Design a protein with these regions (language model features):
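Catalytic cores of TIM-barrel enzymes
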Residues: 1-116, 121-256
Length: 256
C-alpha cells in the first residue's frame, strides 16, 4: 500500500480502518484530502500532513540492485495527487520527507547499507547525490505549488553508528546539498527535525538564531514568522510537538 500520510516507521495514524480504506484505493487528491482530514481530526493537528514517499517494497540485499533502489527513491508517484490535495485543502499543508541517507536506507537492508558504505563508497555517494538532487526538485515543485511547509528528517543518519567521517560524507553533506537547492517562496518554509539540525550545527554546517515568539501553536506560529520576516529554514524543535511552553524559534542559516 502506498501512503502519502506516513513514513514506514510512523504508521500509527494509518490504523484507522477508514483511512486505510481510502489509501487502498487508487490515489487521487480528493482521497488523500479525505484521509488527511480524518487523521487531522483524530490528532488535533493544526496542519494537514502528507508524506512525499510511498511505502517501499522489501529492501534490497544485493549491490546489483542499488540502481533499482535509487530509481525508486527518485520517483515520487504520489506527488501529483499531493499537489492536487494541497490545492483543495483550504488549510495549511505540511509535506514530510526523508533526507537522502534515510530515504535510501528505507530501500536497502540495513546491514548491507553500512557494509556498502565501506566497500563501495563511490557508488553509494553517487546514489545519494542523485537522491538529494531529485528529492530537492520534487520538494521545490511542491513549495512552488502551494505546500506551506516541508518537514525534513534524517532518522537513520546516526553519527554514533556511522562514525564521523561517514556521517559527514554520506548523510550531513547530502542533506546540506538538498537544503541548498530549496528556495521556499515568501510565507513557506523548510523545517528540520531537531536531531538533524543539531547535528548539522555541531559540525559547522549551519548556524541558528533564536527568535522569541508569542505562545501558541508552534507550526502556525512558524508559518506566520515565515510570512512576516521571510524566514525560510527553521529547526531545533519538533514540528509535531505543536503545543509547548517554549516560545523560542530557531531560524537556521547554512554555513557550508
Amino acid at each position: 500500500m502506498e501512503s502519502a500520510l506516513c513514513y514506514v516507521n510512523e504508521v500509527d495514524e494509518c490504523q484507522d480502518p477508514e483511512v486505510r480504506r481510502l489509501l487502498a484505493l487508487p490515489t487521487t487528491g480528493r482521497r488523500l484530502l479525505s484521509a488527511a482530514r480524518r487523521v487531522q481530526a483524530g490528532t488535533g493537528s493544526a496542519l494537514l500532513k502528507l508524506s512525499l514517499e510511498a511505502l517501499p517494497a522489501e529492501p534490497i540485499d544485493s549491490i546489483g540492485e542499488l540502481e533499482e533502489a535509487v530509481r525508486a527513491a527518485c520517483s515520487f508517484p504520489l506527488l501529483p495527487s499531493i499537489l492536487e490535495c494541497a490545492a483543495l485543502a483550504g488549510a495549511p499543508v505540511m509535506l514530510r520527507a526523508q533526507a537522502p541517507f534515510s530515504a535510501l536506507m528505507l530501500r536497502v537492508n540495513s546491514r548491507r547499507m553500512f557494509s556498502w558504505l565501506c566497500r563501495y563508497p563511490a557508488a553509494m555517494q553517487a546514489a545519494l547525490e542523485r537522491i538529494a538532487e531529485r528529492t530537492a526538485g520534487a520538494l521545490q515543485e511542491a513549495l512552488d505549488s502551494g505546500i506551506d511547509m516541508v518537514s525534513l528528517a534524517d532518522p537513520s543518519a546516526m553519527p554514533e553508528l556511522l562514525g564521523e567521517e561517514r556521517y559527514l560524507r554520506f548523510a550531513a553533506d547530502m542533506l546540506v546539498r538538498e537544503l541548498h537547492r530549496l528556495e521556499p517562496p515568501r510565507g513557506a518554509l523548510v523545517h528540520l527535525c531537531p536531531r538533524a539540525s543539531r547535528a548539522l550545527e555541531e559540525r559547522g554546517c549551519l548556524s541558528a538564531r533564536v527568535i522569541e515568539a508569542k505562545p501558541g501553536n508552534y507550526p502556525l506560529a512558524a508559518l506566520g514568522m515565515a510570512q512576516r520576516e521571510g524566514v525560510t529554514l527553521l529547526g531545533h524543535r519538533c514540528v509535531n510537538c505543536e503545543w509547548s511552553s517554549d516560545t523560542r524559534m530557531y531560524a537556521l542559516r547554512l554555513t557550508k
